[in-house]
Regions:
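Long, terminal "pre-/pro-" and other extracytoplasmic accessory regions
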Residues: 2-11, 16-175
Length: 175
């Protein structure tokens, strides 16, 4: 996992913690499960809102999670909003920074992304995931970053976000 991806996860965690929303709720769902309602909430916030990231810091081995964070960007206002989904609860929060490249088209759901990452060497007991665009211009692609954990020796795997094709893996040096 790149340092940029780690910073993005840290930003999302900080947004949730400082919003006082915490991270824990019963029940698990895949990343795609809350997308429709999250998008509705974001469109009410800003009509031109586009999805730029989906992530969770507490993912189960089957690729489901109790909490998902959907980041949206408004090109007109240049503002960001994170919709936190916990079970059947949806809460939007405007934040100061985030990603602006929109996720366009279909993407692999989190259950398949975690399964593909495991096939390609993902290792660890504290799974977190993030789906976002990477690259510049016509080289921009959609990626799943599937992190096995942050302990020394844990392995994170990056996959093509649409197909699940292996891109790379990184071994965590430990902190």
């Amino acid at each position: 996992m790149t340092h940029r991806t780690l910073r993005v996860f840290a930003l999302i965690v900080a947004a949730v913690v400082f919003a006082g929303t915490g991270i824990a709720v019963a029940g698990g769902a895949t990343a795609r499960a809350g997308l429709g309602k999250s998008t509705e909430i974001a469109k009410k916030w800003q009509g031109d809102a586009v999805l730029t990231s989906i992530s969770s810091l507490e993912v189960q081995p089957d690729g489901t999670a109790r909490t998902w964070l959907y980041m949206f960007y408004s090109p007109a206002s240049k503002k960001y909003n994170i919709v936190t989904v916990k079970g059947t609860s949806f809460e939007g929060l405007e934040v100061n920074s985030g990603m602006s490249l929109p996720i366009v088209g279909e993407f692999l759901d989190s259950d398949r992304a975690v399964a593909e990452a495991r096939k390609n060497g993902m290792k660890g007991s504290s799974i977190s995931v993030g789906l976002n665009m990477g690259g510049i211009g016509k080289d921009a692609r959609l990626y799943w970053s599937v992190n096995g954990g942050f302990e020394k020796g844990d392995v994170s795997v990056t996959l093509d976000g649409k197909t699940g094709t292996f891109v790379k893996k990184d071994v965590m040096p430990g902190f």
